[in-house]
Amino acid sequence: MCIRDSLFTGWENPGLTEIGKAEAENAGDLINNLGIGFDCLFTSALIRAQLTGTIILKAINQNNIKIIENKALNERFYGDLQGMNKDECKQKWGEELVQTWRRSYELGPPGGETLKETGDRVLPYYLDEIHPMLMQDMNIIVAAHGNSLRSLIKYLDKVSDEDIVKLEIPTGAPIHYLFNEDGKVMYKKSLIE
């Protein structure tokens, strides 16, 4: 979502707004307080997530770690809503239907992805690329998007299809996870209270 213009951004590729840059700097400061040395940053193929990641790395003074970009971590594709103003969408299709498309697990906008379909590309990538690094005791940052992260959190936290509609991930709000040797979540904490 493009906050500046209240647009469904999806796969469109704008940069960060000044608010987005400030949120990334704040997120970096919060992550820096953990005192963790990171091994790798995973991000999407979209510039706003890449910029968020590089701003965070600068804030934690770890600019030299490996950065891996992959479209599997891209935001959800919004189809016919892509690039449209949220209020215009509500006028055209009705507020309730637009809200259902945004939050539902199995219903998506016309021509767009459902959250389930977003997860169908995010989770294999996580399991094939990110999870093995975690199992090697590496510290990873993932700088991605609201819906790609919702898909990942649904898996990690075992959130039901029904409860995922309530999960909201604020922009610029880092979440710290620790995993045991079996890859199960043993600790989770939002760094923004």
Q: For each predicted feature, which ranges?
A:
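Short catalytic helix/loop segments, enriched in acidic residues and glycine
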Residues: 9-28
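Short glycine-enriched, charge-decorated loop/helix-capping segments at active-site entrances
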Residues: 6-15, 84-86, 115
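Amphipathic, non-transmembrane alpha-helical scaffold segments
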Residues: 17, 21, 42, 46, ...
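Short, small-residue-biased leader/transition segments that mark boundaries at the very start
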Residues: 1-3
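Short glycine/proline- and acidic residue-enriched helix-loop micro-motifs
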Residues: 97-117
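Phosphate-coordination/substrate-recognition cap region in phosphate-metabolizing enzymes
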Residues: 25-99, 154-178
